[in-house]
């Protein structure tokens, strides 16, 4: 791929230009094979591992945001050797919540801050697009991450989530999961295309057949595995207040497994203190989130939440999710102030989505999709 190598050559040249005090030029040596001996192999692949590792380390550390982070992806495209080393450095920084490869969309977000995203809605096609925000502006698209399209089938509605904004087939390589609602649109089930743990069984039905999705985890055939539920509470008395919701998510088992998209034991998305978890027989755990209770503003005569400027339009769809705290913990109340996911309206068809650990971009997007649509029994 001459284009990638050309771009990378300029990037490496600039990197060493600004680090001349740390690098030296090696003298010519007879141990270096002549060009004729390298005709059958790439000079990029023949680079010394120490030098190659230093180059990729610098690129990975300095290019921590998109669009500059595409240089890290370029490194992984040079050769197999470059790809292995790049993946090693990318895996070592998983706790940072950086999004580099498609597999990062199913890994937990940052621990100490939120990944800020935008959701764009196309009402005509019932399609929703998730972008990673690159600037504070709500009008900039940012970097495309995922897309979802709503399909109505019989008594339920499905949202097919894909890496490709033009391909929503469950048999596609771009298929990453789906969201299914009941008839009333108050109960939702989240399905992942990859098993959440070893021994997980796909859901029953023809939609659970195994697919050839390879962009998230090439070694694991895709299917439909239940990984979470979102429920909206009924409001039959029509009392004042926003929607009330509870989200129950399945977290990977503590032991590392290949089915967790490269997730290691010290990077599991349940690594948040005092979050209530219910252990399962399969070794995984359920993380329970609930919407943060708003306060009534007497002057404005409306329910209010502090979105810190990330939501500008009042809407029943707006919400913030916090951890359900174990009441046996004496200091547990403090965790209810940490917003793990917030979603809100900033335009007619534009919404913000900010998430952090233990949620992944895929899980956060699925939860936000449940807010679209009318829920007469809950409002």
UniProtKB/Swiss-Prot annotation:
SUPFAM superfamilies: Tubby C-terminal domain-like. Ubiquitous. Pfam families: Tub (PF01167). It comes from the Eukaryota. GO terms for cellular component: cytosol; nucleus; plasma membrane; plastid. Residues 42-97 form the F-box domain. Residues 18-41, 193-212, 248-278 are annotated as: Disordered. GO terms for molecular function: DNA-binding transcription factor activity; transcription cis-regulatory region binding. Residues 18-28 have a biased composition (Polar residues). GO terms for biological process: pollen development; regulation of DNA-templated transcription; response to fungus. InterPro entries: Tubby-like_C, Tubby_C, Tubby_C_CS. Belongs to the TUB family. This is Tubby-like F-box protein 7. It comes from Arabidopsis thaliana (Mouse-ear cress). The gene is TULP7.
